[in-house]
Amino acid sequence: MGNGSVKPKHSKHPDGQSGNLSNEALRSKVAELEREVKRKDAELQEREYHLKELREQLAKQTVAIAELTEELQSKCIQLNKLQDVIHVQGGSPLQASPDKVPLDVHRKTSGLVSLHSRRGAKAGVSAEPTSRTYDLNKPPEFSFEKARVRKDSSEKKLITDALNKNQFLKRLDPQQIKDMVECMYGRNYQQGSYIVKQGEPGNHIFVLAEGRLEVFQGEKLLSSIPMWTTFGELAILYNCTRTASVKAITNVKTWALDREVFQNIMRRTAQARDEEYRNFLRSVSLLKNLPEDKLTKIIDCLEVEYYDKGDYIIREGEEGSTFFILAKGKVKVTQSTEGHDQPQLIKTLQKGEYFGEKALISDDVRSANIIAEENDVACLVIDRETFNQTVGTFDELQKYLEGYVATLNRDDEKRHAKRSMSSWKLSKALSLEMIQLKEKVARFSSTSPFQNLEIIATLGVGGFGRVELVKVKNENIAFAMKCIRKKHIVDTKQQEHVYSEKRILEELCSPFIVKLYRTFKDNKYVYMLLEACLGGELWSILRDRGSFDEPTSKFCVACVTEAFDYLHRLGIIYRDLKPENLILDADGYLKLVDFGFAKKIGSGQKTWTFCGTPEYVAPEVILNKGHDFSVDFWSLGILVYELLTGNPPFSGIDQMMTYNLILKGIEKMDFPRKITRRPEDLIRRLCRQNPTERLGNLKNGINDIKKHRWLNGFNWEGLKARSLPSPLRRELSGPIDHSYFDKYPPEKGVPPDEMSGWDKDF
């Protein structure tokens, strides 16, 4: 410019330059981070994919392990059975598969059979009966207050935690655990002494409080027992022989509980609960006139639900199908009223009061709100569907109470009289034959039965004694003589069970139950003279074949169902169903034998003694909840499974494991392919964990089993009339042909005299 001025150059402001550089750096950093995120995402996806693969592999391996475990267990049982068959065939190689062993294999080879062939047979177990009328040394009446032992709160907590860690005990009710803790008492042992000794009977459960214990089998060390661990729990269920020894390595302190105290606690808490629930139900106008058996079923269906303060149990205007009884706490009842924006308090309900009872009759639109007034409110709940399935609809119950059912039954009997005439004639013929034989044996000496009878062969042996095939001297009339060692009965406190078997069998006359003709006794034995059924044991045939086809299984199940129908009508529960207790008569029809665990109970009543065969006992027996006829339906489901597969569904390496498997239930169990859909459905419905949900124990009773689709088309009338050919019939050469039974060695030694007098009325 003319004035010499110079135009300044444009220059970047230092701050602007810094800002641009900063933005570029950020963009670069973001790009780098994005690349890193993508890399990490790819890496994460790869790891997730790898993890998914590992999970799938783990799931497959878990399934494979479960299948292999089940298969191994099955193979072990099957191995025993195959070894038994080898013994049956005199050690020769098997010529046929287990499914194709002919029915008469036993007949051809029975002379070669030894006691080894009994190895797979299942044995029954029993605690002392709760009613020990014939036990001259029975203890005094149980008193919970006298059984309690003082402990501080920290000891109680440690014992409670130890019991709750145990696989079996953790399933008991909290109140039962609490009572057990109260009654456990201290037992101290010196170093080197035995707390439990292998081979000796057990009577206590223990919790280790101080010291060190080791478990031995023979001379072999198996394990050590950690502090505050429970052991010996099987002994509180029933009288059993210890399978291992527990030795004190140091001085030891334990807490112990006796079997008798445990069983009294279980019975006491369950009976108290049932009585409380029964009183609640008797206060409900809709239910107060129901008979005891219906009330008992409702009690067993009740579930406990808990609510905290402010929780709505029922909302006004909602439809409901559930009935509630307040078991603990308080609730308030509020209702919408004209002129108020908020529902108004109507009243407060307390323990023992109920609401929602109209829901048992039909869908009920709730007319008020029911709200918990405090924490831990407990309600007993039953819904209409459960109520209807278990005891019937309200209309059905009304008819029942008015006597309409009795009228309908009489009309039904008239309608079916002609159809049932053949089975009535058969029953009459059986009764006449039984009377004639009873008259004959009534003349025999009551203390010397073998003056008139001679032993032909041994049909069976057991812990109790032996069963001998006998015949009347100089006559072609045969019987089975059950010889029970009196000393064994006293030692195991089973006097009540023996008397119960006698009383029950004397009352029965059914073509599906073995007949009792006479009893005898001497200084060493009590005897039962029974019907001789010489077609063999169902267990032996199942052992030889491996499993049965469906038609044969249906026939067996039908025979048992008829036997149960007859027994349950008389108020008798059987409690020991298994193939070992089913025997074939000359026509191949099955009969129930061994009524040592059978018991007569009143309508709506329960019984408490732990008894049965481990693989067949129902969950409520294991948990000492009290049981009734529904245990027989459970065992029928187990029998169906064993007939079709050759093995029961629950079988552990020891009895306690078997019980824990039973308590886990059958619902989630995978069935083998040889059990088809229909029998599987029957088994699952018979083996429901809740007794009130079992087929046979619903409102239609045992008819639900007979009408199950697996048994569709079965000829029940032909079975009852014995005109239906048996798939298990075998030829007999005469009344003393015992060729279908295993051969047993002579009894070793002579049992001692037992003269306490418990059998004076036998």
UniProtKB/Swiss-Prot annotation:
**Residues bound to 3',5'-cyclic GMP 2:** 347, 356-359, 366-367, 412, 415
List-wise, which residues carry Phosphothreonine?
609
Query: In terms of one coarse class, where is the protein primarily found?
Result: membrane
Claim: Kinase is one of the keywords in the record = yes
Q: How does it sit in the membrane?
A: Lipid-anchor
Which residue stretches belong to region cGMP-binding, high affinity? 168-283, 286-416
Domain named AGC-kinase C-terminal: residues: 712-762
- Ways its activity is controlled: Binding of cGMP results in enzyme activation.
Q: E.C. number, please? A: 2.7.11.12
Enzyme class label: transferase
**Residues with a covalently attached lipid (N-myristoyl glycine):** 2
Q: Which tissues is this protein detected in according to the database? A: Highly expressed in intestinal mucosa and is 20 times less abundant in brain and kidney. Expressed in jejunum, in the apical domain of the villus epithelium.
> Entry's SUPFAM superfamilies?
cAMP-binding domain-like (SSF51206), Protein kinase-like (PK-like) (SSF56112)
- The record places domain Protein kinase at 453-711
- State the signal peptide span: none
Q: How is it modified after translation?
A: Myristoylation mediates membrane localization.
Residues reported in the UniProt entry to bind 3',5'-cyclic GMP 1? 232-235, 242-243
Question: Phosphoserine is carried by which residues?
Answer: 110, 117, 431
Q: Which InterPro entries match?
A: AGC-kinase_C, cGMP_dep_kinase, cNMP-bd_CS, cNMP-bd_dom, cNMP-bd_dom_sf, Kinase-like_dom_sf, Prot_kinase_dom, Protein_kinase_ATP_BS
Q: Where found in the cell? A: Apical cell membrane; Cell membrane
Q: Where is the active site?
A: 576 (proton acceptor)
Task: Enumerate the residues binding ATP.
Answer: 459-467, 482
User: Function of this protein?
Assistant: Crucial regulator of intestinal secretion and bone growth. Phosphorylates and activates CFTR on the plasma membrane. Plays a key role in intestinal secretion by regulating cGMP-dependent translocation of CFTR in jejunum. Acts downstream of NMDAR to activate the plasma membrane accumulation of GRIA1/GLUR1 in synapse and increase synaptic plasticity. Acts as regulator of gene expression and activator of the extracellular signal-regulated kinases MAPK3/ERK1 and MAPK1/ERK2 in mechanically stimulated osteoblasts.
User: What's the family?
Assistant: Belongs to the protein kinase superfamily. AGC Ser/Thr protein kinase family. cGMP subfamily.
Kindly state the subunit structure of this protein: Interacts with GRIA1/GLUR1.
Identify this protein by name: cGMP-dependent protein kinase 2
Q: What gene name does this entry carry?
A: Prkg2
